[in-house]
């Protein structure tokens, strides 16, 4: 059995969904495989910002800095914050155990 970590998705209405997610998947993949409404229109190819999520600063700081392509797409995201990332670019590792991922109230798909 592959190792899992705890991921909490905070949905727009404040509801929290706690999921045991396998290491190596992206936040976008975990959302899709657990019926969480995180769009991902470009399927993780860094061509949109519909998988925009907001992280707690503690976990944001555990990630590598976003690449320029991700930053360019984040500039298009609705409700951008200092701890915004694209869900397709966050790959689960052990150091992210307990991560809380907040979904923004809306998305903007500019392709």
Curated annotation (Swiss-Prot):
- InterPro entries (alphabetical): 2Fe-2S_ferredoxin-like_sf (IPR036010), 2Fe-2S_ferredoxin-type (IPR001041), Adrenodoxin-like (IPR001055), Adrenodoxin_Fe-S_BS (IPR018298), Beta-grasp_dom_sf (IPR012675)
Coiled-coil residue spans: none
Alphabetical GO biological process terms: P450-containing electron transport chain
Keywords attached to this entry:
2Fe-2S, Electron transport, Iron, Iron-sulfur, Metal-binding, Transport
The residues that the entry says bind [2Fe-2S] cluster are 42, 48, 51, 88
Q: Where is the signal peptide?
A: none
Q: Cofactor stoichiometry and binding?
A: Binds 1 [2Fe-2S] cluster.
Q: List required co-factors.
A: [2Fe-2S] cluster
Known role = Ferredoxin are iron-sulfur proteins that transfer electrons in a wide variety of metabolic reactions.
Q: What is this protein called?
A: 2Fe-2S ferredoxin
Could you tell me which species this protein originates from?
Rickettsia bellii (strain RML369-C)
């Amino acid at each position: 059995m592959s190792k899992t970590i705890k991921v909490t998705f905070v949905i727009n209405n404040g509801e929290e969904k706690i999921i045991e997610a396998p290491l190596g998947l992206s936040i976008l993949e975990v959302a899709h495989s657990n019926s969480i409404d995180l769009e991902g229109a470009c399927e993780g190819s860094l061509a949109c910002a519909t998988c925009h999520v907001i992280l707690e600063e503690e976990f944001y700081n555990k990630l590598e800095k976003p690449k320029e392509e991700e930053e360019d797409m984040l500039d298009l995201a609705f409700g951008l914050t200092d701890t915004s990332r694209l869900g397709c670019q966050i790959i689960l590792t052990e150091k992210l155990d307990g991560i809380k991922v907040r979904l923004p109230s809306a998305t903007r798909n500019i392709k």
